[in-house]
Curated annotation (Swiss-Prot):
It catalyses: a quinone + NADH + 5 H(+)(in) = a quinol + NAD(+) + 4 H(+)(out). NDH-1 is composed of 14 different subunits. Subunits NuoA, H, J, K, L, M, N constitute the membrane sector of the complex. This is NADH-quinone oxidoreductase subunit H. The keyword Translocase applies. It is found in: Cell inner membrane. It is a multi-pass membrane protein. Pfam families: NADHdh. It comes from Wolinella succinogenes (strain ATCC 29543 / DSM 1740 / CCUG 13145 / JCM 31913 / LMG 7466 / NCTC 11488 / FDC 602W) (Vibrio succinogenes). Belongs to the complex I subunit 1 family. GO terms for biological process: aerobic respiration. Its main location: membrane. Its EC number is 7.1.1.-. Keywords: Cell inner membrane, Cell membrane, Membrane, NAD, Quinone, Translocase, Transmembrane, Transmembrane helix, Ubiquinone.
Length: 329
């Protein structure tokens, strides 16, 4: 094998290992943050401050019985969780996580595939991930699962359009679909960040991201009070876990995308090196995702569609038109 292939394989293994662990650890962080905001303690008994709770949860998931309902389409039922988890990690392959660095005299580029349509690839693979909940709900032979699948299709397709339209305006300014080029466009300092020239695009992209991740207040796919666990109702054990590993991995990817698109990416921030700066910015957005879950109420499906098609979509189109006019002038 050529050195390039070996390096790519090593990068894939490192990304999958690190972000699988981070996705699991994020569940612990979420429980502690929610507990703090609700005046509770959260996990406390497994390890110091409950930090080993993720190991206990992992053992529980691996040892639980894997049940396939009698009325389910077994092949599709088993494939659906794999689609959700796989697309989450495939999307990461075009995301530049850090600036280049030297390791044992070799220059390492912390991106698996530096393609010139990086943002398009990430959004496209993320859209394919919709088939996970859709196939899971359709194949389960359960009415609650089917309702969850229907909600997943409507919600994710609708907000995928908003997500794509929202980033058109900043892409028009940059003139490239490459995430590295978008990062380099903001290399002049904090005042070159695209969030200052495209605040509406940032808000639209962030809201659409919440909806595509199935995060509060847009958690309609598996809302317990209405449709039990939605598309995941009939799942147990590690198959159930794969859905939520995919969800938290997508959350990390979205945080990186927001930072790369609007907040200077991995460019140095004053005296802070670029690698540390991007981690701090990503951590802020991950905390924001958890904070919103604790603070915001659940909304109805009709309200969600109204917001998408009658508020967010026109605003995204208006932003594109205004940006085009400004660029022409």
């Amino acid at each position: 094998m050529t050195p390039y292939i070996i390096e790519t394989i090593l990068k894939v293994l490192v990304v999958v290992a690190i972000f699988s662990a981070l996705a699991g650890f994020l569940t612990y962080v979420e429980r502690k943050v929610l507990a703090f905001m609700q005046r509770r303690l959260g996990p406390m008994h497994v390890g110091p401050y409950g930090v080993l709770q993720i190991l206990a949860d992992g053992i529980k998931l691996f040892t639980k019985e894997d049940i396939v309902p009698v009325g389910a389409n077994q092949t599709i039922f088993k494939i659906a969780p794999v689609i959700s988890a796989a697309t989450a990690f495939i999307a990461m392959s075009a995301v530049p996580f850090f600036p280049e660095f030297e390791l044992f005299g070799h220059t390492v580029r912390p991106i698996i595939a530096d393609i010139n349509v990086g943002i398009l690839f990430v959004l496209g693979v993320g859209a394919v991930g919709m088939y996970g909940p859709l196939l899971a709900g359709m194949s389960s032979g359960n009415k609650w699962s089917l309702l969850g699948a229907a909600r997943a299709t409507v919600q994710l397709l609708s907000f995928e359009v908003v997500s794509g339209l929202s980033i058109l305006a900043p892409l028009m300014m940059v003139g490239s679909l490459s995430l590295i080029e978008i990062n380099n466009y903001q290399s002049g300092g904090i005042f070159d960040w695209l969030v200052w020239s495209q605040p509406l695009a940032f808000l639209l992209f962030l809201i659409a991201g919440y909806a595509e991740l199935n995060r509060t207040p847009f958690d309609l796919l598996e809302h317990e009070a209405e449709i039990v666990a939605g598309f995941a109702t009939e799942y147990s054990g590690m198959r159930w876990g794969m859905f939520f590993i995919g969800e938290y991995a997508n959350m990390i990817t979205l945080a990186f995308l927001v930072v790369l698109l609007f907040f200077g990416g991995f460019n140095p921030l004053w005296f802070i090196p670029g690698g540390i700066a991007i981690l701090l910015k990503v951590a802020v957005f991950l905390f924001l995702f958890l904070w919103v879950r604790a603070a915001w109420p659940h909304i109805r499906p009709d309200q969600l569609m109204w917001v998408c098609w009658k508020v967010l979509m026109p605003l995204a189109l208006l932003n594109i038109v205004l940006t085009g006019i400004v660029l022409i002038l």
